[in-house]
């Protein structure tokens, strides 16, 4: 049993503690003040010190404001902060070719020296002619690792050095109403007899040779077993008003169309040399879309000079090209206008690299059929040279190319010979071919064969400068409607 004295002393001690306000335990807040570690930055004395990078951000995680306090410059703070948050993106030296790297949040930026560009300073890829035609509207030529743009006759180069601006009311190569519509086609036309021919290109000079119509007085008979000596549009669709403004039609003394042509200028029409054997005398009609109905746009012109290529080979149709100079100028209007002549290199690298060209004419609508009374047009794909040569039983020279389909029943045919093959580039149409020959019309596995105009651009330009030979200089006297015939030896 407890001693009564002890109990009295214990009670007195407890009473004393209560009266003094002391406690064995301390409050939670007081305990936290004792146990918690005081942060350096929150210390009264520390706040009075200038920011220190090691103290602020290396020993502990810091905020952007604390880093800014250290650097006292926002740009330097950003450079530090980008590395501090997600590491240095420039550590691996991603900028090539002496480029300078600048780190960012989850990214980096390269400042490149001249001649390099891109995210990592790759060598500059010049926008030369092979890439989007160098940005040129029309002709593109590469010079000193840059491009030089130029334009066809009747256009001027814009201030940006790229665009071509028309300087004429009716510029070449423009369709002023409607649009070309695609139509399947198989190109083939009249077939020449079997005989080899030279494969060569030409830019020869012009010299006066034959008397007027000497050649035309003795037309060469069509090759044996040839379904035509002219060429046509099989399939295709009607040319709407203004869609084929460069189409010309050669008409004989009976006012019947027998060959086509391409308007080059107000005085000049391009056609096939073999067409000169189809009539003793002929005129040129333009603006005609329906041979049975007058629409008020038609014009008929007498021919003053015929410039036939002197190397034309009747047996193979090689060098199948001629230029006609008219006695009176063509009146251009919305549905009568020239096609553009291209530059040689550009024509071969750009125009003939397009998928398709356009052929038009009044030829037969099927092999051995009747001539069309309405002007037809047909879109035909270019055919690679190997396929072209394999498809033909005859020689395909360097002055020829193929176009058309090998299985679709569409092609140029008898009556279309000499007519235009044009290629569209950025809404301007350029002369790329002359309808020349084919094995039948739209036969399976056969294509239409065209004179390759790019081989004769210099020759065409010289021919367009030719003038009529005075009667006294001619070996004979031409009739009132007989043109002077010139040749063009190489």
Swiss-Prot record:
Residues carrying (3R)-3-hydroxyaspartate: 103
Protein modification: The vitamin K-dependent, enzymatic carboxylation of some glutamate residues allows the modified protein to bind calcium.
Disulphide bonds in the chain: 57-62, 90-101, 95-110, 112-121, 129-140, 136-149, 151-164, 172-340, 239-244, 259-275, 388-402, 413-441
Reactions this protein catalyses: Selective cleavage of Arg-|-Thr and then Arg-|-Ile bonds in prothrombin to form thrombin
Residue ranges the record assigns to the propeptide: 21-40, 184-232
Start-end of Polar residues biased regions: 203-212
Function text: Factor Xa is a vitamin K-dependent glycoprotein that converts prothrombin to thrombin in the presence of factor Va, calcium and phospholipid during blood clotting. Factor Xa activates pro-inflammatory signaling pathways in a protease-activated receptor (PAR)-dependent manner.
Name assigned to this protein: Coagulation factor X
Organism annotation: Oryctolagus cuniculus
